[in-house]
Amino acid sequence: MTASHGQAAAIPTVTLNDDNTLPVVGIGVGELSDSEAERSVSAALEAGYRLIDTAAAYGNEAAVGRAIAASGIPRDEIYVTTKLATPDQGFTSSQAAARASLERLGLDYVDLYLIHWPGGDTSKYVDSWGGLMKVKEDGIARSIGVCNFGAEDLETIVSLTYFTPAVNQIELHPLLNQAALREVNAGYNIVTEAYGPLGVGRLLDHPAVTAIAEAHGRTAAQVLLRWSIQLGNVVISRSANPERIASNLDVFGFELTADEMETLNGLDDGTRFRPDPATYTGS
């Protein structure tokens, strides 16, 4: 990992399998209204975040684009991720959807374009992956990847297209630490990107988490984010509160001990707070 430049110099980056880079911490805007998303992204950029994560299905790409434009930060210092909605899957439709996302964002390219969900139709997501390969070739996206893909899904697209995703974004927190899938990702040199790192807030008052937080003089959220970073993940948190947004970026001035990591790893019980990708067909 290396440090990025400018205001966000303290944020390390990870190199993807296509030699592009991503900051290891980003802000997400899922389930935020337009006004909330715009305020959240503005606050995040001001705090020093440079990785912004949205999706067509969130319905707030235009708001994200407005916040980016208003920030005055050079485009090449910001990393923008958006995602292909399940109804838009398909070889041709995925390319059209990517261009529509660019238009809503008001950008010439995105840094990362992801298939949002497998969606339950193998042939459809394989065709979509072919579309994303064209999206990358055409310069619409610098890097391409997937969200919520299991080991079999990854094997399918890699074996059929001979092109490996740069990123697999998955639900990941101490109750669902995804050790097996992280190992599969690593075997393909795919970066694991963690969403839902705070367990939709339910882990913030977990006794094991709060005890570690007290030991370090940190917030529970900072401990949860730090745990994920130390596992080697890129981590995407979400908040509409500017103070929490700034606090959640302050995760590089301390390190969890091996025992603390083991304690948090030991909380894994398979609990999901988001849909199970193996059966989910929504967007």
Curated annotation (Swiss-Prot):
This is Aldo-keto reductase MSMEG_2407/MSMEI_2346. GO terms for molecular function: aldo-keto reductase (NADPH) activity. Keywords: NADP, Oxidoreductase. Coiled coil: none annotated. It holds the Pfam family Aldo_ket_red. Belongs to the aldo/keto reductase family. It comes from Mycolicibacterium smegmatis (strain ATCC 700084 / mc(2)155) (Mycobacterium smegmatis). The keyword NADP applies. Inhibited by the antituberculosis drug isoniazid (INH). The active site is at residue 58. Monomer. InterPro entries: AKR (IPR020471), Aldo/ket_reductase_CS (IPR018170), NADP_OxRdtase_dom (IPR023210), NADP_OxRdtase_dom_sf (IPR036812).
